[in-house]
């Protein structure tokens, strides 16, 4: 009897381990059913940040801007009162320096002509007016600019004056009319250079003479 029961149990166990496709399919179906029970979540829809619409009231108009003339940002020059007790001025056309008449023995057209010759600038004198040949500028940024200067000496009973004005101005060989800013700069630069060079040379002569006397 026990043997019969044991055989029956063995048969049931073997039946559970059967490789029958139908049996396996039933097992797989039960697994799929358990998988469908897993919940699925959809993305959370949020309203986000609502930005205000752009207001065109202060928008810049979309227009084509034409380039204007180049602006000269270099600092201007003025005539300097290098001579003792002198007065300087730019009158819109000329730079001038007025000084005591006794100083005219140093600051005069003859000295100016000699100085220009040393710089390689030729000139002609007609009475109290000296006219230079074309002279290149030494201003940084200038391109092929040349100037003809007119230098005049004016004398009264008490004072003497030197004035510098622009007679002609050209760039790359083409003559053009300088504006007031150019006139002020270039006439002041030329007058200051003349007076400073003559003053420096005169002071050097005095120092050399003083050294000779001491020895």
Curated annotation (Swiss-Prot):
<keyword id="KW-0732">Signal</keyword>
<dbReference type="GO" id="GO:0009279">
    <property type="term" value="C:cell outer membrane"/>
</dbReference>
<keyword id="KW-0998">Cell outer membrane</keyword>
<feature type="lipid moiety-binding region" description="S-diacylglycerol cysteine">
    <location>
        <position position="17"/>
    </location>
</feature>
<dbReference type="InterPro" id="IPR010653">
    <property type="entry name" value="NlpB/DapX"/>
</dbReference>
<dbReference type="Pfam" id="PF06804">
    <property type="entry name" value="Lipoprotein_18"/>
</dbReference>
<keyword id="KW-0564">Palmitate</keyword>
<comment type="similarity">
    <text>Belongs to the BamC family.</text>
</comment>
<keyword id="KW-0449">Lipoprotein</keyword>
<feature type="lipid moiety-binding region" description="N-palmitoyl cysteine">
    <location>
        <position position="17"/>
    </location>
</feature>
<protein>
    <recommendedName>
        <fullName>Outer membrane protein assembly factor BamC homolog</fullName>
    </recommendedName>
</protein>
<keyword id="KW-0472">Membrane</keyword>
<feature type="signal peptide">
    <location>
        <begin position="1"/>
        <end position="16"/>
    </location>
</feature>
